[in-house]
Amino acid sequence: MTMFKGSNEMKSRWNWGSITCIICFTCVGSQLSMSSSKASNFSGPLQLYQRELEIFIVLTDVPNYRLIKENSHLHTTIVDQGRTV
């Protein structure tokens, strides 16, 4: 027994709304966890580009700094005249 005509349509719309809500919370949650301290070492393409850009800015603003890339690693080290900074 339905209370009004179109009850199935309302249920369907409610389900789609809740699914959309769950997807939104999942996306927001994953973005927050990506920016948390535990996920700060994530080496995805966007994070690598951003880190390279920040290092480039530091290197171009401060004279006598050079960038050394470790062999076969994506990590970078900044060295100031032989001393690791």
Swiss-Prot record:
A cellular component term, taken from the record's GO annotations: plasma membrane
BP GO terms, sorted: endothelin receptor signaling pathway; vascular endothelial growth factor signaling pathway
Domain of life: Eukaryota
Spans within the Cytoplasmic topological domain: 38-85
Localization in the cell: Cell membrane
Chain ranges passing through the membrane: 19-37
GO molecular function: endothelin receptor activity; vascular endothelial growth factor binding
Summary of the function given for this chain in its UniProt record: Dual receptor for both endothelin-1 and the signal sequence of vascular endothelial growth factor A. Does not act as a receptor for angiotensin-2. Does not bind the VEGFA mature protein. May play a role in angiogenesis with a significant role in cardiovascular and neural development.
Protein name in UniProt: Dual endothelin-1/VEGF signal peptide receptor
Upper lineage: Eukaryota, Metazoa, Chordata, Craniata, Vertebrata
